[in-house]
Amino acid sequence: MELEEVGVEANQPNNDQGSKKQNKNKDKKVKKEKKIGYGGKKSAEENSNFISWLTFSWADRFVVHCFRHVLQLSHIWDLASYDKSAYLAEKIAISWDVEIKKPKPSYIRAAFRAFGLYFVLSWFFYAIYAASQFVGPEILKRMVTFVLKSRSGISTEDPNMGYYYALIMFGSAMIGSVCLYQSNMISARTGDRLRSVIVLDVYRKAIKLSNSARANTSPGEIVNLMSNDAQRMVEVFQLVNNGVFALPQIIVCLALLYRAIGWPTFVGLGLMLAAVPFNGIAAKKLTEIRRHLVGFTDKRVKTTNEILQAIKIIKLYAWEDSFAKKVIERREAEIKLLFSFSRYRAMLIVIVAALPTAVSVLVFSSYYGYYKKLDAGEIFAALSYLNILRLPLGFLPIIVALGIQMKIAAQRVTDFLLLPEMKEISKIEDPSIENGIYIRDATLTWNQEKKEESFTLKNINFEAKGKTLTMIVGSVGSGKSSLIQAMLGEMDVLDGSVAMKGNVAYVPQQAWIINATLKDNILFGSPYDEAKYRKVLEVCALERDIELFPQGDLVEIGERGVNLSGGQKQRVSIARAVYSDSDVYILDDPLSAVDAHVGKHLFHRCFKGILKSKTVILAANQLNYLPFAHNTVVLKAGEISERGSYQQLINAQKEFSGLLQAYGVDESAVNEDVEDDKEIEESDNIVVEEKTKPTEKPKLQNKDGVLTSQEEREEGAVAMWVYWKYITVGGGFLFLMAFIFFLMDTGTRTFVDWWLSHWQNESTKNALAVAQGLEPSGLTDTQYLGIYIGVGMTSILISAGRNFLFFEYTVRASRALHHQLFNALLRAPMSFFDTTPLGRIINRFTRDLDGVDNLMATSISQFLVFFTTVVATLIIISIITPFLLVPLAPICIIFYFLQFFYRYTSRELQRLEAISRSPIFSHFSETLGGVVSIRAYRKKEENILTNQFRLDNNNKCYLTLQAMNQWLGLRLDLLANLVTFFACLFITIDRDTISAANVGLSLSYALSLTGNLNRATLQAADTETKMNSVERITHYIKGPVEALQIVEDHRPAPDWPPHGAITFDNLVMRYREGLDPVLKGISCEIKAKEKIGIVGRTGAGKSSIVLALFRLIEASEGAILIDGENIAKFGLKDLRRNLAIIPQDPVLFSGTLRENIDPFNEKTDDQLWSVLKDIQLHDVAKSLEGGLDSKVTENGDNWSVGQRQLLCLARALLRDPKILVLDEATASVDGHSDSLIQATIREKFSNCTILTIAHRLNTIMDSDRIIVLDAGKISEFDEPWTLLQNPAGLLNWLVEETGPQNAAYLRRLAQAKKDGVNIDQITPPISPTPEQKPFKNADIDNINSPPQQSLKAEDNPNPKALDNSGDNNNNNNNNNNNNNNNNNNNNNNNNNNNNNDNDNDNDNDNSEAGDN
């Protein structure tokens, strides 16, 4: 899995011992790593001595190691104990507990309370650094005076004083550098701690959120908190010291400036004060824009996340353009604000960056105007102070902008952490009370704040206890799933009480699968017990499936269960519950996704067998199982209408009887005898005898069964094409203009300083000439002053142009990259999404895009500024002191190697940091999808620990990267300080010939080199790391793509297809090149308007036919023709828009009801209402506020699953296609609704060619013909009645497996079709009675295997297992897993899957049978 792919397994316990040879190799590797000090060892920093810690020398060997080896996560030291997530979580929890009691809690205050000592320590070091900065200008002034006196011959100082000055300047600079980088490291560590605790607390809170809070907070918004908002903290705290000390530095600089040049200082101060209001206005606007900007970002990420989760449905419906438009609109709104934000930020930078130049020009002009002279010592000391002033002033706008963002981010985090949490269900500890669920006089709602608008359960009295099976039934929207959720504590209790005794296991209606092996999904963190595990596989009918996977139960399932069919996912979910050995089992319609014979097996061997000693609560649509339940609860409109035993309810002749009639069950034929099928039950028991083997940890790793692709990771330097991509994507000419302005800006600033030195030199010469009675030469002082002011003002204008041009460019580039990325993903094939975790993709749209949006501009602009400044500095110093070129050559060589080693290390660390970040988001997305299961299974703490583990792996990359930054910075400062030292040295040697002005200019520039060289190098590295985001985005932009959406030369006619005939011509399909085909030479002809049923066992290829027809997977060989036209020649959009499908998984999107059924707004209101009436949702829609424009929440959570399925039918009705595919289309609705839907399909699609993939055979027995698939081939294809005459046929076997009564009913349906009789007149089967014991003599162990003559094992490989791509039949949740559905008798009713949010109900005790 993801973390293992980048070496995380080195830090986890290895549960798979493997062969001795592997262990020996591993031991050698570990010994080698320990020898060099990496991989699992304690932090090198934590174990270093004081000098090594102070100078970051502990990282030397690591840098060399990174150069020699491709860096892996396992090579990096473990985090220091004080950096680990567990420690940080404990610290912030204590602080937040104090803060939350205050009237206005603040997460930032809590963070300062938790980590305040680190801030103090950081400030201590930074204060020493700040003080050391002022030593240089003082020494510079003395050095100029020393040279002047030496040249004039009146010096009384020690001739060696220049050397002493050089040593003092070097020493003070080195002390400052050491303190600076320690301060930086502590600040970076503190920022990372804050990011970590935000991620930890947001994750912890997300698991605990109440349902009403979750309804108002989308996953995209929460992901933003963990990525963008948390990242803001890191960025601010990296620069916090610059912000804290900016004002003190400015004040000290001004004081020293006043001492040097007197009152002209106040002229500069006045200019600075005049700029304050403008800074304030810009800062206020930035705050306002940023507050709105994060909201638009949240919306964009939320919509993107929703689209990516449902990408398969969008492709099937050819809705890419509609959803692209929605995302682009939200992105454009975001970009509009981003432009505004960038322009105000540019304005703030211009004001602040121009201040040093403007102040210099104004101060020196005033100085000359008042004193009529230029003193070299004072002027260049002042110039050094102004250069020092440049840094805090330059950082001010950055800190202001980041501070604004941090404030907003902190408030968002605080608001989120203050959201209401789910209240734990009352736990009953009284040993005299039996295990079970107890609800008394309860009124419950989904959203307490909007209880009028949300579904409510009223007057609920429910009890399920002891060794009983209680079934909950009701029509679509009656409240079955809601009652199930109420038992789990997921609904708000308005009145009454909900209590529980014992531990709970929960099986949701839509199975939640984690991205791990099948075995891990079943164990779910529980200890491994071989005997119990094997028993669970048997009763959950998983043995045969596991045999077909090449890796067995170690097969990697993939994200969202992509490698399994819908039925397989549900059986894994049931197996997880059974293995947990809980006291109470709450099952929400688990049989809807499985075949009838598998459902039979699960009910009798699992629910009534192995769980017979447990309390089992089962919400279901399969009424044929009701006679076997101890109690039945009937729900209607959110209330319990009846309760009691099956026979009691029949005798009452109330709501239950009407429900049976709606389902088509003949109650009069039901036998009252409800004797238990004891022989079945007694064969199963979850208690494992003590003689079983001791428990052992399961093998978590599987090297062969990897489905999820390893995240791409480039090696070496970021390729030049990535830079070129960024330069050209936003408009190459604009970038070129901005770059030219950068060069002109540095050139004019340098010229201003040089001109001042030249003016001083000429002024001194002219003064000497006048003293000797000679005429002064050259320009007058007034002219020098005019040029000085003119060039200075020009420099300010160029700086403004540079900033506005460059920020304009970066926003354009960001817009283009997003659009290209999103469009590329919309056009990516399904195989890409099946093998790429959603969290990894979302990471591109959050962290990576945020880097391009907000950080790239600052990073590149600062690099260009510092780099050009360093080049200019070296040129100036070398011209003035040519001898400096001698030591400069080796210094440059050392510099080259230092930055080379650093860049190699830092970019690999950055890539590892990015790769190790994705699993955090993947795990988070996975957690949000299964939060109810996590709560029910009491796995909150285990998941929190997993989050901590993944966060620690990410943090050790980040902190090591920060340590590398300080390691390099200190060594670069040493080189820069050596340059200053040698400059002083050569000036001292050459003091009799060099001018004082040149001394001042050289040393003032040399002093600035220390910081500038380091910043230029770090910004170069930072720019490269930011380019990693562009690289990662571009990797997806250049990824695999589907065929063209439109082929202009092959556009179909407007009325295509005219008839709807389909021909499969020797169709061969495989999911990826090199894999075995899943369809093997499919050939058949389907006539226009023909109704075709498609059945087959799991893995037979049913869903693969759908994928091939819609070209989600392209044919490897052969062709599919529609009305004689090869579909391969059409564009995908033209093809898919002319087909229709009702998928098994009903998906709704946030927006309006209208947008969900008519996204292109092509139909009139009357048409929409007419369709809603056809699907029995007219009254429901009318009752909603807004009607057609009523709100649909994310994932359609405010509609039940059954209602969502009906809306999918509405989409097909509106499309009015010639070809319709039904992929188990009525699995999520009750029997009555199923009958209505089938009637609607027969009526409204009578002129359509219909392909029906079915688990429930009653839905296809009225088909004109049935295709029976077996191992990717057509085993049988004929009329239903004809196929049933073959006793050895696969269809005949499947029919027989539904039980005697249902088999007879299915045969009557087939005969009615043959005889032309209306099938609605055929009497459905009655419910089976226990004395029939239909399973008593059944060969349960072979229930999944048809007759040998009709299905050979070697001909039936599981396509999902063979192709670990996840694109398979499996991932479609497709009925792949079992095709004929529902037990013995529920014909239509068997419509299984009624997952309505609202549909839960449950009531158990027979004693209260007559209450209602």
Swiss-Prot record:
Compositional bias segments (type: Basic residues): 21-34
Extent of Low complexity compositional bias: 1367-1397
Membrane-crossing residue ranges in chain numbering: 115-135, 161-181, 236-256, 261-281, 346-366, 379-399, 724-744, 787-807, 854-874, 875-895, 967-987
Compositionally biased spans, kind Acidic residues: 1398-1412
Topology with respect to the bilayer: Multi-pass membrane protein
Disulfide bonds listed in the record: none
PROSITE patterns per record: ABC_TM1F, ABC_TRANSPORTER_1, ABC_TRANSPORTER_2
Location relative to the cell: Membrane
Alphabetical UniProt keywords: ATP-binding, Membrane, Nucleotide-binding, Repeat, Transmembrane, Transmembrane helix, Transport
Name of the protein described by the UniProt record: ABC transporter C family member 3
Highest classification ranks of the organism: Eukaryota, Amoebozoa, Evosea, Eumycetozoa, Dictyostelia
